[in-house]
Regions:
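Short, small/polar-rich motifs associated with maturation and membrane association
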Residues: 1-358, 362-371, 446-447, 684, ...
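Conserved C-terminal beta-signal and adjacent last beta-strands/turns
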Residues: 23, 323, 362, 762, ...
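Hydrophobic beta-strand positions in extracellular immunoglobulin-like domains
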Residues: 46, 111, 200, 374, ...
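Surface-exposed loop/interface segments of Gram-negative outer-membrane beta-barrel transport/assembly proteins
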Residues: 117, 132, 244-303, 345-444, ...
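Extended, hydrophobic alpha-helical segments in both membrane/secreted and soluble proteins
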Residues: 212, 357-359, 508, 572-578, ...
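Residues on the lipid-exposed face of transmembrane beta-strands in outer-membrane beta-barrel proteins
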Residues: 240, 269, 322-326, 357-363, ...
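Transmembrane beta-strand segments that form the barrel wall of outer-membrane beta-barrel proteins
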Residues: 254, 339-341, 588-597, 639
Length: 1014
């Protein structure tokens, strides 16, 4: 440019005006020519830093100009630029990048997520909303952390991820996962509603967790009211991965893990068992069992079975998935195929195997959007077997060491006990579960098709139809066998039970939405009509009478019986929602839903759900001066009413047996009798929730914090009310709306992300507190008793209710001076006379602690440096008590096996102990429900830890990303609990939630995995 300037001065000084003008033109042409010669073509590929996948539609702008281009479906671009230019790469939800051209002709860019933005879109009921605009309580799951939980059930992924959400699971392959949101809201069903891609499902059990894109938890009435009667226990919304316009991308993930029981019990070996059991017999005035008497010829000295060593082995877990994604704007696709298998860590055929496929298609043509979803799952589960309600784990721990695992002389080939030799009733769990076949097969097909058309600007109509079909076959064959004197199955008892059936659910959603922006005002409205139908069919057959080795088919049984049942449930709902925002400062939302269901009688089959919520973004107010490091302050609150309709079909119709007979003067006369007396006025349970919260964003929103308080009042709860025996009903009670309870608590969550340096890290944590109080039980307030628990008005649901101990009777004088304690002897437990009436009775039982954790928490830590990354997920709960029934059984001093603690039992020469004398029959009931077996349920776990390494791949390789990782689960448990795991899954999640009767312990799992993107 300096040369041209001098040329201009020279021409102006020496040449006439015409010649000077000609010189100017020549100079301009030269300048243009020089400029053209300085431009260059810059090309490159833009990818997502998160998954290394091409990013189509990214804008590339030359700074300070209008020159712009976009990336194609493969993420490629080309643009003319000068060395002095700066390219700006930008795209929605990604942080913009500026790169100087200089001499570069190829510039590849990896765009990072814009972590400072609060414009993340979250899925809510029948729609989406910006996270910053939420006025209700919606917990967003950190999927990067949640997906590192190796599991067959997506519900397990929620554990510790969202404040106020508690999850209980077990180590049984394919076992049930128990999830609660903000405590217990009902005496019956407390399970939340699951919605997958807009489809209502009972649970996500049949769906591959690896195919999930996002998960949101709707916790308050404002967010869940749009689901009406189903939303009372909270809603979990799951969105699976959708197709993205672009070239075909293939992802493969493979994982193989090894599972072992994390903790074993200390139980007695042969000598310890024989010592304690012999003492128990002598204390009861009995002779020593021949098998335990060294002076008897039947004394057992050659069998010393450690049943835990015999049963526990290394279980295997496998998970392989293959996903395809790509397409065009007209039709994009995502298909995921997933295989999962888990063999048990107990030596038995029990395992769980599942094959699933999910296909999502979506596209857009002008004003018309459309899509479909097709999913299929086939699963096979071999179930564990228990005897008369005793769990397999409880039976395993109680198995005596003088019983062999195998015995070729017994029918079936497995060992057992002998009544005359050992006198013990002890189940060979290994033999029991290898002889019995208990299989469940499931085939599930789901389909969904939808279309959305924009009628005029802002006004859209959407039609959504879905279909869900489950077919199942359950078979249980109990063959003729001999597992000891108490567990002999004769030919007449050998049986085959077969249950086949199907469940079909159809939904039709008609939705109309409208959006309008007028200056600072924004309106969003939703109106809809929802129809549904559920059909259930079951056919069962039973065959009895099989010879040993006979084919387990119904036609070979000596006798057969069969039956079937069929049920249909229909429902119609009307929904509406309105959102209003003024100047991005004041937010308001209202929801309304009316449900009508055939579950209730005609007079009570309709109910209304509604909610109101509002938010104030203080940080957007001009009159509030905030420090620079404070970016966001928002206050929000909500109130709403929901319902609960989880009752059986025809629950309002009394059942009559018209084939009953009555005995009159020794003659049978025909007649009728009431089978079940039901309330024709039974109605919906009600749930009202109030919620207030404060949200903060600091340091460019890298640090975010939320504090929340809620009160949830449940009324009209279904509960059994006693009936006079004159009604003829059995049981003599009727279930009606006569219960109420309250849950309240605080919830806190915080997160911090730092991605500005070579070492990137993030920290997130959540804490939830909960207080449960029962307000009403029936008409007269009669308490409800569970296993070692009592539910009473004014207290928490399912509190432990037991006796208190006061040492051991050391001599006859102490025994005589104590309150009357029937059948007590020296060496027995002394119980406290709580009511002071001079005798020990049921009236002396007291509440010993709540079983619902007072607090639960979770913490995610993750970091990455260059190609390495590491993450840890800690989770815990506390403030609750656990009744350790397994420990009670092992401390009973009877014929079953014992805890090693029993070796320190009381004797006249060993009085400095708190372990009572063993005595057969336990006349003093030393093993009754008491604080001897109540323990703190507090724990903290290293639930997941993963270390990954991203293998460098050439830019020209067809492999876009390759990663190796090592994953560990349940690696460390910090707890004082004696049992295998304080995080157990109780069969009864309500009245006996804190009763550990032998749930399958969660195993310690170490997995090796590979991820490859093509």
């Amino acid at each position: 440019m300096k040369t041209n300037h001098r040329l201009f001065l020279y021409c102006n000084f020496l040449l006439p005006k015409k010649e000077w003008l000609l010189a100017i033109i020549v100079m301009l042409m030269a300048t243009i020519n020089v400029s053209a010669q300085n431009t260059q073509i810059v090309t490159g590929i833009v990818t997502s830093a998160k998954d290394k996948m091409p990013a189509p539609g990214v804008n590339i702008l030359i700074k300070g100009t209008n020159t712009v281009t976009t990336t194609d479906l493969d993420g490629q671009y080309s643009i003319k630029a000068a060395p002095s230019d700066i390219l700006i790469f930008s795209y929605i939800s990604y942080a913009s990048q500026e790169i100087a051209v200089s001499t570069k002709t190829q510039i590849n860019v990896a765009l990072k997520d814009d972590l400072t933005a609060l414009d993340e879109v979250v899925v809510i009921g029948y729609g989406t909303q910006k996270k910053s605009d939420l006025s209700g309580s919606v917990g967003v799951v950190n999927m990067e952390s949640a997906k590192k939980t190796v599991t067959y059930d997506a519900a397990k992924m929620l554990q510790g991820q969202v404040a106020g959400v508690t999850v209980q699971s077990s180590g049984e392959p394919g076992g049930f996962v128990n999830i609660k949101i903000r405590g217990l809201n009902s005496f019956s069903n407390n399970n939340p509603l699951f919605v997958i891609d807009g489809m209502i499902v009972d649970s996500p059990f049949d769906f591959a967790p690896g195919d999930i894109e996002s998960m949101q938890v709707l916790k308050d009435a404002s967010s869940a009211a749009i689901y009406g009667v189903r939303g009372a226990n909270g809603v979990v919304i799951i969105t699976t991965k959708k197709g993205k316009a672009g070239k075909l991308n293939i992802k493969y993930k493979s994982l193989v893990g090894f599972q072992n029981v994390a903790k074993t019990w200390d139980v007695t070996d042969r000598l310890g068992y024989q010592n304690i059991t012999s003492a128990a017999e002598l204390n009861a005035g009995l002779s020593v069992a021949p098998g335990n008497d060294p002076n008897n010829s039947s004394y057992i000295s050659d069998v010393n079975t450690n049943w835990q060593d015999a049963a526990y082995e290394t279980g295997i877990i496998e998970n392989h998935s293959l996903a395809f994604n790509g397409g065009t704007e007209d039709l994009a696709y995502n298909m995921n195929m997933d295989y999962f298998k888990n063999t048990s860590y107990i030596k038995s055929p029990q395992d769980y195997e599942r094959l699933s496929m999910n296909l999502n298609l979506n596209g857009k043509k002008g004003k018309f959007k459309y899509g479909t979803k097709i999913g299929f799952t086939q699963s096979d589960k071999e179930n564990f077997n228990s005897y008369v309600g005793e769990t397999a784990i409880a039976a395993l721990l109680g198995a005596i060491p003088t019983m062999p695992v195998y015995d070729e002389n017994r029918l079936g080939g497995y060992g057992g006990t002998d009544n005359l030799t050992q006198r013990a009733i002890s189940l060979n769990v290994i033999g029991f579960n290898n002889l019995i076949t208990n299989n469940g097969k499931r085939n599930r097909f789901i389909g969904n098709i939808w279309g959305e058309y924009e009628i005029v600007k802002g006004l859209k109509y959407k039609l959504d139809a879905s279909f869900d079909r489950l077919d199942y076959v359950n078979r249980k064959f109990v063959p003729q066998s001999d597992l000891g004197w108490y567990y002999i199955t004769t030919k007449e008892e050998a049986s085959l039970d077969v249950s086949t059936g199907n469940e079909t659910k159809t939904f039709l959603n008609n939705l109309l939405t409208y959006s309008l922006d007028i200056n600072k005002h924004r309106f969003d409205a939703l109106a809809g009509w929802v129809q549904e139908r559920k059909d259930y069919y079951n056919h069962w057959s039973r065959g009895v009478g099989y010879d040993f080795g006979e084919i387990s088919k119904l036609q070979y049984a000596d006798d057969n019986s069969t039956g079937e049942s069929e049920t249909a449930i229909t429902g119609t709902s009307y929904i509406s929602r309105i959102n209003y925002s003024f100047d991005d400062r004041y937010l308001f939302q209202a929801n309304f839903r009316q449900d009508k269901s055939s579950l209730f009688s005609e007079n009570y089959n309709t109910t209304n759900a509604y909610s109101f919520s509002g938010a104030w973004k203080l940080s957007n107010e001009k009159f509030i001066n905030l420090p620079e490091w404070v970016n966001t302050i928002k206050l929000r609150g909500s109130y709403g009413k929901l319902g609960n309709n989880t009752i059986p079909a025809y629950f309002f119709a009394t059942t009559i047996n018209s084939f009953a007979g009555y005995n009159f003067n020794n003659e049978l006369a025909p007649g009728t009798t009431v089978v079940a007396s039901l309330d024709p006025n039974v109605r919906w349970e009600d749930n009202k929730t109030t919620d207030v919260a404060l949200e903060l964003g600091m340091f460019n929103n890298a640090l975010q914090f939320t504090a929340e308080y809620f009160v949830k009042n449940s009324s009209n709860l279904l509960v059994g009310v006693p009936l006079p025996f004159s009604t003829g009903a059995f049981p003599a009670s009727i279930t009606t709306n006569a219960g109420a309870m309250r849950n309240k608590g605080f919830e806190f969550s915080a997160s911090y992300n730092n991605n500005n340096n070579a070492f990137k890290y993030s920290i997130s944590a959540n804490l939830g507190t909960l207080k449960n109080e029962v307000l009403q039980i029936g008409i007269n307030g009669n308490p409800i008793y569970g296993a070692a628990s009592k539910t009473e008005v004014g207290r928490s649901m399912g509190e432990i209710y037991a006796y208190e101990t006061d040492g051991i009777f050391q001599n006859a004088a102490e025994l005589a001076a104590a309150p009357t304690q029937t059948n007590a002897g020296v060496g027995d437990i002394r119980f406290k006379d709580i009511n002071g009436d001079g005798m020990i009775s049921d009236l002396d039982r007291t509440f010993q602690g709540v079983t619902i954790p007072k607090y639960s928490y979770g913490m995610n830590l993750s970091g990455s440096y260059k190609n390495w990354d590491i993450s840890m997920f800690w989770q815990g709960a506390g403030g609750n008590k656990v009744f350790n029934s397994i420990y009670r059984n092992l401390m009973s001093g009877q014929y079953g096996n014992h805890s090693t603690d029993m070796l320190n039992y009381w004797t006249p020469t060993n009085t400095n102990t708190d372990i009572p004398r063993p005595i057969i029959g336990d006349p003093n009931a030393n093993g009754r429900d008491s604080n001897r077996f109540i323990e703190d349920g507090d724990y903290i776990k290293l639930q997941t830890m993963e270390i990954g390494y991203e293998i460098p791949v050439p830019a020209t390789s067809f492999i876009q990303k390759a990663k190796l990782f090592v994953n560990g689960q349940n690696l460390l448990i910090i707890s004082k609990y004696r049992g295998s795991d304080p995080d157990f899954n109780s069969n009864d999640g309500s009245f006996s939630r804190g009763y550990d009767g032998g749930s399958f312990p969660n195993p310690r799992t170490v997995s090796l995995g590979l991820e490859v993107n093509f």
